[in-house]
């Protein structure tokens, strides 16, 4: 569910171990007041940095193999002093923003085989009472994995890989007011569910069908759920993509999380690092290692790589990295 690896795929069980370790170590915290509170907190820590919203970047200028400028749709040109960290998908960076001659032939060929993760459908619910779970142990859980036993999970993953809309979707369900009482008035519940569509199926009708089936599964596990609903909003793959160009076709992880596109294979076979073949340009999105999630790791890796090219060992680190990149991409 958290990735798009079938249960029988190589190392698919690693995600379960990772989540279990995280739960034991730090739990699954949520921002008080909603997801926007996390963005607001980051803005408060930017100090003297200049933030520009709604400024669409159309091109990254490259001169003598180095990123030198960033160009926007409004015609503005921003000169690059130290580095560019691109928080965009790998296909968007290498196929849309950079000149073709700046990308090694082998990397261009590898990008033709880039694989997206499966589309997501997210349904947001407002309920006028707590969720009437059959199992009372779920009443205090912030996050619930719901909808399939072992056999059901196998059926669901088979449907995902064969292009069949699951009749009983497996889902992740979040009880937001249970986790954060500021999300809705006392005695009510703000919640959401998300599940996947089979790869390549992103039409609105299929998304709406899955949303109806998600509701049926919830009603099975919590009789009276539907009667408690006062509103719901379905975010289809088209809605997700319209709100964030990185969510290509409703894919939220910046590319498949399966082993063929992880670690040193992310986003293409290489070093598994944030550096790109263009000097001074770093990939800091979920298309880079370690992939999607609200963890900031890909951006942190990119920032550290950019800073690491300066200082006492910077020139040596830069030369070694660029030589290795040239070796594996040309």
Cite the ranges covered by each PLM segment.
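Active-site/ligand-binding neighborhood in enzyme catalytic cores
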Residues: 1-49, 54-55, 247-256, 260-261
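A glycine-rich dinucleotide-binding beta-alpha-beta segment and adjacent secondary-structure elements
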Residues: 1-7, 167-172, 224-289
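Active-site-proximal substrate-binding core of FAD-dependent oxidoreductases
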Residues: 56, 62, 235-238, 308-330
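Mid-domain catalytic core of redox enzymes
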Residues: 58-184
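Hydrophobic, well-ordered secondary-structure elements that form the walls
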Residues: 85, 125, 193, 214, ...
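Conserved FAD/dinucleotide-binding core of flavoprotein oxidoreductases
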Residues: 91-96, 126, 185-217
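Flavin-binding catalytic cores
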Residues: 130-131, 152, 162-167, 184, ...
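A conserved FAD-binding loop/helix module that cradles the flavin
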Residues: 284-307
